Amino acid sequence: MERSATLEMLNVHKPDARQTGDILSRYANALWPPALAYAASVAAGYVFTAGPHGCRCGKAMTEAARVGVFLGVLCALYNWMGSGDSFA
């Protein structure tokens, strides 16, 4: 069986420009909240470990705490954006 016949049987088609734009828009909407949460956790990790203030008060922040900050910010963003239907 030829490849084109197989693709027709599977109803596979090449997306047009509008569909491609819709797909890229959905991916962009789904990726920015985790990226923002990661940036916030990196900033919190910097403040609590290296810090611009130079004191040793935050040197004990562990990797588990950084993951907690990341997950907390991610959950806050998820709740702030609503039910999550905009991620789909």
Swiss-Prot record:
Keywords attached to this Swiss-Prot or TrEMBL record, sorted alphabetically, are: Host membrane, Membrane, Transmembrane, Transmembrane helix
Q: Name one GO cellular component term.
A: host cell membrane
Instruction: Keyword check for GTP-binding, yes or no.
Output: no
Q: How does it sit in the membrane?
A: Multi-pass membrane protein
Superkingdom of this entry's organism? Answer: Viruses
Location relative to the cell: Host membrane
Mainly localized where?
Answer: host cell
Q: Does the keyword Glycosyltransferase apply?
A: no
Residue intervals passing through the bilayer: 30-50, 67-87
Per the record, the coiled-coil ranges are none
- Report what the protein is called: Transmembrane protein 069R
Q: Which organism is it from?
A: Frog virus 3 (isolate Goorha) (FV-3)
Its taxonomic path starts at: Viruses, Varidnaviria, Bamfordvirae, Nucleocytoviricota, Megaviricetes
